[in-house]
Amino acid sequence: MTPDMPRLTLYEAPIEGSITMDGSEKIIIDVGSPIGTPRTLEGYIDLSPMESGDTIIIRQYVKLRPDEDYRRHAEETYTGEQPLSLLYINPRPVKYGVRITAQQVTGTYKTLKYQFYIKRV
């Protein structure tokens, strides 16, 4: 590849679905990289079902070594109706693994939709 050639962005098939809250910490996505191949994860979680009285915690974990456990990288709490209801998970470099979870701690349990993309680096 010469310096003036553009780099191709290769996305794997999107990972999408929905998950129903039940009070426990639920795994939305858990992506390991085979043989430590670097990748980037980004995506969306739809918080539009949230209403007054609801509290949902979104946590992000990263694995730094293949033989280690995940370590919490970030945690955000969302309460009540969300005026910006589509939560964007910023691109996260992944070598050995990344996990995104949700836990609803108050309110009537909701079902959250999600869509994530994995990009080969």
Where are these regions (language model features)?
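C-terminal interaction-tip segments
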Residues: 2-19, 104-121
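Tryptophan-centered short beta-strand motifs
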Residues: 25-26, 67-72
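Beta-strand elements of well-folded, non-transmembrane domains
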Residues: 47-49, 62-64, 120
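Catalytic micro-motifs at enzyme active sites that drive phosphoryl/nucleotidyl and oxygen chemistry
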Residues: 86-88
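Solvent-exposed serine/threonine-rich low-complexity stretches and specific carbohydrate-binding patches
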Residues: 71-81
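Short, surface-exposed beta-strand/strand-loop-strand elements in extracellular ectodomains
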Residues: 53-66
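Noncatalytic modules at the cell exterior or secretory-pathway interfaces
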Residues: 37-45, 90-112
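Surface-exposed ligand/attachment interfaces on beta-rich extracellular proteins
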Residues: 14-36, 50-55, 82-84
